[in-house]
Amino acid sequence: MTGEPDGPEDGTRGERIAKWLARAGVASRRDAERMIAEGRVRLENRVVATPATFVQPGALVTVDGALVADAQRTRLFRYHKPDGLITTHRDPQGRPTVFERLPPGLPRVVSVGRLDFSSEGLLLLTNDGALARRLELPANGWIRRYRVRVHGMVQERDLAALARGVTVEGVRYGPIEAGLDSRKGAN
């Protein structure tokens, strides 16, 4: 029912409790670790002392005395993000977030990557943080394609500069493949 931190590495010990709580929709992994540190989480009626504790399927887990249902299977959602929303759970500036606008009844989800506040388009959401990280890593070779509207005229030299990589405000960005779909006036 509970694997201690020094259990086997073969997957039979279950899943770390903070990750399990996050997949169950209780809280983010970081918030779950905080709950554990505060002594609010119990596994098989014993206070969990460390987030390195492992949970087996079917184990009895409670938070603040309330039973937590088993973690959900991994799910992936498509969301059309309109402009004017920020891709974060909490914005210190008080701007509206993607997560505040999701329909009720969804599990707790995280975004796969992000779109800027003024951007709109497809945003993938998942209840599995590890999947989100795998999909975000450039080393995994996922091709990302963006369509943008540019105000002003784009010259061939601008596209060539993007193909070589650019530095913006001291940050170096790698090369990207860019082309024009269409030209409409000054857009």
Show the residue positions of the predicted features.
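Basic, flexible Lys/Arg- and Gly-enriched helix-loop patches that mediate nucleic-acid binding at interfaces
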Residues: 2-187
